[in-house]
Curated annotation (Swiss-Prot):
Subunit structure, interactors included: Heterodimer of a large and a small subunit.
GO MF entries: ferredoxin hydrogenase activity; hydrogen:quinone oxidoreductase activity; nickel cation binding
Subcellular location: Cell membrane
Protein name listed in UniProt: Quinone-reactive Ni/Fe-hydrogenase large chain
Protein encoded by which gene: hydB
Keyword tags: Cell membrane, Membrane, Metal-binding, Nickel, Oxidoreductase
E.C. code: 1.12.5.1
Annotated membrane topology: Peripheral membrane protein
Top-level taxon in the UniProt lineage: Bacteria
Known cofactor(s): Ni(2+)
């Protein structure tokens, strides 16, 4: 007899996501469904607006990936108008991307995903002196792991526990059987969790140097950047470099070491050795380091075969809505995408409750529509995007920087290449992508310094002919994977706009053929230890770093409400 488990909401992510799974009598997941429960609708808001404003609207898609959508909106319009920004502008944008990656991935591992690996209550039982000595096993120069520091961290969290309230650590499945770290290892990660709060603040300041503020920077404009004086001010350049070195140091001495430690301990934990059932990977070049070299490579790897990189045919990219809450079901290219809503709601069913008993709740209509996310496909096939795709495509393309960091990690952990195609591997790949920026971000900085000596231009002039029609797109790899924005311009205003975001590729539903997207496929076949504590589900989904940004209602250009959708509170099976 099968049972259904609903995890709603999936917390420690950006946005609103629920996961439903069907398990058999052995607690093995037989089917899975990914549902985004609120609507964004930003594409509709952009229609009829000046294309030069696109980036300022698109960065409001979410409060985490602000710069990614900002740059995408600006760059899509530049592509449509045939504008090439000066090299200085491109390099400043690279420094902003590097700042974002260092911030985003550090926050994800420690503050969003880390508690799926680290048992906080176990850390309270650790011997700080033993933990301090153990840290040297994973780093020749560990950070925030002195015996006195670890004792202070332990005492700080113990004070929360003594009051019967673990504060930010209160809502989790502590003591779960799939936690594998020793108390001392948990204490090391806990110390780095707290240290990362300081590090992410510095990384945000790096972005603000070039973008005026973070989140929602303001310095990009169609044609270039406006942070001209910052690029010419030695003190601002030095400030960015100092902060960059500080954050990069943490990545190499803490983040890298902690993932190496996780690889050693969790390589025998079955629940993290699967989680990658769509082995098609899509990456696109991003972060120019100079006139000719990019940090990331472009291409598609199919069926996990890293001996071949397929060139991208953009005409094969489509989105369909057979199982999404939109009226138009057929597969459309993003230039022609539609987003007229068609919300059909949930149905009643019994599911496994928090105490393991069956409870009545609302579940999706799995044969109908069940999410606000469309199903992107490439030639009819699902693709995974994100750091794992960056590393896999980079290895297949023989990208020297990616080869170096990935090869060193596999050597340090003793893991085979096949281990990358797992939940553990996906988590490691995000760290490796962060390490790429930590190890090679200075190349873009040095290129900017060198180019400013001979050329100080930061902007390319242009005109928009209102009698012409334009179309263009941005495509590039951002922290959560390949992001693309597609724009049509007519009569000097935006006629149509589509954003195909990384979590669209990964979190999308099955298509008309019943083929699952990466989230859904990643859960099938995994065994749960305890149906009332589905930590394994949380860990797999968090490894993708979900970003389900959305809006509840949409306004037309005159401020009139077009539609409003209320998502009723759902009695859920499990919360985390």
């Amino acid at each position: 007899m099968t049972k259904r488990i609903v995890v709603d909401p999936i917390t420690r992510i950006e946005g609103h996501l629920r996961i439903e799974v069907v398990v058999d009598e052995n607690n093995v997941i037989q089917d899975a469904f990914s549902t985004a429960t609120l609507w964004r609708g930003l594409e509709t808001i952009l229609k009829g607006r000046d294309p030069r404003d696109a980036g300022f609207f698109t960065q409001r898609i979410c409060g985490v990936c602000t710069y990614s959508h900002y740059k995408a909106g600006i760059s899509a319009v530049e592509n449509a108008l045939g504008i090439k920004p000066p090299l200085n502008a491109e390099l400043i944008r690279s420094l902003m991307s590097i700042s974002l990656i260092l911030h985003d991935h550090t926050v994800h591992f420690y503050h969003l995903h880390g508690l799926d690996w680290c048992d906080i209550t176990s850390a309270l039982k650790a011997d700080p002196v033993a933990a301090s000595k153990l840290a040297f096993k994973y780093s020749p120069n560990p950070i925030a792991t002195g015996a006195d520091e670890l004792t202070a961290v332990q005492k700080r969290v113990a004070e929360f526990a003594a009051k019967g309230n673990l504060g930010p650590f209160a809502n989790a499945y502590w003591g779960h059987k799939t936690y594998r770290f020793s108390p001392e290892q948990n204490l090391i990660v806990l110390s780095h969790y707290l240290k990362a709060l300081e590090v992410q603040r510095v990384a945000a300041q790096m972005m603000a140097i070039w973008g005026a503020k973070q989140p929602h920077p303001q310095s990009l404009t169609v044609g270039g950047v406006t942070s001209v004086m910052d690029a010419l001010d030695p003190s601002r350049l030095g400030d960015w470099l100092t902060k960059y070195k500080y954050v990069a140091d943490f990545v190499n001495r803490a983040y890298y070491a902690d993932v190496v430690m996780a690889a050693e301990v969790f390589k025998s934990e079955p629940s993290v050795l699967g989680g990658c059932n769509v082995k098609n990977f899509y990456s696109y070049q991003e972060i120019p380091l100079n006139k000719t070299e990019w940090m990331y490579s472009t291409g598609i790897v199919m069926d996990g075969d890293i001996t071949k990189v397929h060139e991208i045919n953009e005409d094969l990219i489509t989105e369909e809505a057979t199982h999404a809450w939109y009226k138009e079901n057929k597969a459309l290219h993003p230039y022609d995408g539609q987003q007229d809503p068609n919300y059909t709601g949930f149905k009643d069913m019994e599911t496994v409750g928090p105490d393991g008993t069956m409870v009545k709740t609302k579940v999706i209509d799995e044969k109908g529509k069940y999410t606000w996310i469309k199903a992107p496909r490439y030639g009819g096939k699902p693709l995974e995007v994100g750091p794992l795709a960056t590393i896999v495509v980079g290895l297949a393309a023989k990208n020297p920087r990616i080869e170096k960091v990935a090869t060193q990690f596999l050597k340090d952990t003793g893991l085979p290449l096949a281990a990358l195609f797992t939940t553990l591997g996906r988590t490691a790949a995000r760290m490796l992508e962060c390490k790429l920026s930590a190890d090679y971000g200075f190349e873009a900085f040095n290129s900017l310094i060198a180019n400013l000596k001979v050329d100080q231009s930061t902007y390319t002039t242009y005109k928009i002919d209102k009698n012409k029609e334009y179309k263009g797109r941005y495509m590039g790899t951002v922290p959560r994977g390949v992001l693309s924005h597609w724009v049509r311009i007519k009569n000097g205003v935006i006629q149509n706009y589509q954003a195909v975001v990384p979590s669209t590729w990964n979190a999308g539903p099955r298509d008309a053929n019943g083929t699952k997207g990466p989230y859904e496929a990643s859960l099938v076949g995994m065994k749960l230890q305890d149906l009332s504590q589905p930590l394994e589900i949380i860990r797999v989904i968090h490894s993708f770093d979900p970003c389900i940004a959305c809006a509840v209602h949409v306004m037309d250009t005159k401020g009139n409400e077009l539609s409003q959708y209320r998502v009723d509170p759902i009695t859920v099976g499990c919360n985390l």
